[in-house]
A protein has these predicted regions:
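ABC family nucleotide-binding domain
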Residues: 13-236
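C-terminal boundary and immediately downstream tail of ABC-type ATPase nucleotide-binding domains
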Residues: 3, 233, 237-258
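Pre-NBD coupling/linker segments of ABC/ABC-like ATPases
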Residues: 1-12
Length: 258
């Protein structure tokens, strides 16, 4: 019998979705981001870790210009992130962000929170917006809560709604800014499960998180930041088992001990 060749699939991240070149940002005299260089390929899952105040959240907020920067260059799908309104509109249509705090409108039902932007910003018909919203509420296992209001949901449920709202844009890139840090410990798993599912679907994701178990399991690359700089980056296996810098070794000792 002829022996069949076994082909092992490998991920191809050659198509660049995010390109960051020599990025610098100051808050007054405080140099918060120092010469950051980072590329993110299509379908790549990048986890950004580091101590509080290291510039992690500021970095990803610069990607869709929620934060302005003073020096350097950022491109999203080849389009420069700058003050040009047309560029910014196109970039933000391709990039969705999930925040630490859910930022749901308390006076709107869950379904209305999800249909508001598609209808009023992007001009989608109500039925289309509603159908899309229900699809993604089902995707995050919370469709039965569609008619409730945010204060009737747990923190974990609200964060899943926030993820569904982000998905309603059909974004090419998803940014997560510490999406579990405001949750009670028992609610963290349900949000991470949704994020793991998105990763398996091939979404391009940049995640700021302290959840090192998620980084080990899902990330293609883990980046360690400290004092506004990228100190080290590597695949998860090397990052956790063979850290090169003393600063990363200390960070891992402290965070993995808890």
């Amino acid at each position: 019998m002829e022996k069949k060749e076994i082909i092992t699939a490998t991920k191809d991240f050659s198509e660049q979705m995010v390109e960051i070149d020599t990025l610098n940002k100051w808050y007054g005299d405080f140099h918060v981001l120092k010469d950051i260089n980072l590329n993110v390929g299509k379908g790549e899952i990048v986890v950004v870790a580091g101590p509080s105040g290291s510039g992690k959240s500021t970095l990803i907020r610069c990607i869709n210009r929620l934060e302005e920067y003073q020096e350097g260059l950022i491109k999203v799908k080849g389009i420069e992130v700058n003050a040009d309104v047309k560029n910014l509109r196109e970039i933000r249509s391709n990039v969705a962000m999930v925040f630490q705090h859910f930022n749901l409108f308390p006076h709107l039902s869950i379904i209305d929170n999800l249909t508001l932007a598609p209808m009023w910003v992007y001009g989608k018909p109500k039925k289309e917006a509603t159908d899309t919203a229900m699809h993604y509420l089902e995707r995050v296992n919370i469709a039965e809560q569609a008619d409730k209001f945010p204060n009737q949901l747990s923190g974990g449920q609200q964060q899943r709604v926030a993820i569904a709202r982000a998905l309603c844009k059909s974004p090419d890139i998803m940014l997560f800014d510490e999406p579990t840090s405001a949750l009670d410990p028992e609610m963290i798993g349900e949000v991470l499960d949704v994020m793991i599912g998105l990763a398996k679907e091939g979404k391009t994701m940049v995640c700021v998180t302290h959840e090192m178990g998620f980084a080990r399991k899902v990330a293609d690359r883990v980046i360690f930041m400290d004092e506004g700089q990228i100190v080290e980056e590597n695949d998860p296996e090397t990052f956790f088992k063979n850290p090169e810098s003393d600063r990363l070794k200390l960070f891992l000792e402290q965070i993995l001990a808890h």
